[in-house]
Amino acid sequence: MQANLLNKPDGRTAILLPSGFVLDLLAPDATGLPITDIALCLASQPRWGGAARPWYSVAEHSVMVSRLVPPPLAYAALMHDCEEFLGDWPSPVKVMLGLDFVRHRMQPVKDSLRRRFGFHDERPEIKHADLVCMATELRDLLPPAWIEWGHLPAPHHAKIVPVGPDRANALFLERFEELKHLAEPERNVLPPESVAD
């Protein structure tokens, strides 16, 4: 657990994570944030606002995206939704609030996570894989609906079989360990031994 003796974060704007790490959302600094916190929170966050059946997590989605991109992009793809440890808002909610507004407010958090874990996820290949996963989730986990999904590519051929939060947490951490050598040191990532704090 980090301690800032000069500036105690306000509980109304600070997030307490499973390890005891505190992230102040008004001045986010993810230095020292353990990947185990990200993994556990992503494994506990449902995709689709909880509408998917069986229950399906952001961690599972992230692992799938990491497997659908060229190998050099797999680490960044795994981490592409890591800020959603705060909660995975369904896209229609973000559109209703204003995508630019949501991106602007979340940008400091995402940038802090990018520096901490050393990744750059704004790549068209990652976005395409994200949409393929979305289409696959629609096919495999959600009921048919009278909604236009024309912006989505074809789903992946493999069927999604959700594994539940505990296994999703383990899968995310295993994939992270497999890929962390792809972290970009120029993004100020901390030494590998501190990544697994």
Task: Give a label for each model feature.
Residues 1-197:
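Metal-dependent phosphohydrolase cores
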